[in-house]
């Protein structure tokens, strides 16, 4: 019996982006769940304990920054790696994302291949460390 494929939670309020990333990751053999805002991301993360979260930082309501801080502050989810996705390419945003607890940072627009590469790299790093 083989281990289940890693579960990835893709969080983006823009439906087209979310579906594109989710479909590409699923096509690549990963299990994928989707959330459209920070509140839903927190609910699903606590319920499902995904192996990795792809988090858009610009979300309505609870934004990706705050959702990541809450995930990293909770014992149940603090070890789940978070890849930040943002349309802001400023250097300060990547530092801010890391300060919030993100483990990697990708600027949008982001090709699905680039996201998959970062997901695989981050999963490998965390599986090796934990």
Predicted features along the sequence, with ranges:
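The feature encodes the CheY-like receiver
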Residues: 60, 78, 90, 109
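Charged docking surfaces used in two-component/phosphorelay signaling
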Residues: 19-27
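Short hydrophobic/Thr-rich beta-strand motif most characteristic of the beta2 strand and flanking loop
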Residues: 29-36, 44
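Active-site beta3 strand of CheY-like receiver
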Residues: 48-54, 59
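C-terminal output helix
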Residues: 110-119
């Amino acid at each position: 019996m083989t281990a289940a494929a890693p579960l990835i939670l893709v969080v983006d309020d823009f439906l087209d982006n979310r579906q594109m990333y989710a479909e590409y990751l699923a096509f690549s053999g990963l299990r994928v769940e989707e959330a459209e805002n920070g509140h839903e991301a927190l609910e699903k993360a606590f319920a499902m304990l995904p192996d990795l979260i792809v988090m858009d930082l610009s979300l309505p309501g609870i934004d990706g920054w705050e959702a990541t801080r809450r995930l990293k502050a909770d014992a149940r989810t603090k070890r789940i790696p978070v890849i930040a996705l943002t349309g802001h390419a400023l250097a300060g945003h990547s530092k801010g994302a890391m300060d919030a607890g993100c483990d990697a940072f990708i600027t949008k627009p982001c090709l699905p291949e680039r996201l998959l590469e970062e997901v695989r790299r981050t999963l490998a790093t965390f599986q090796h460390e934990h």
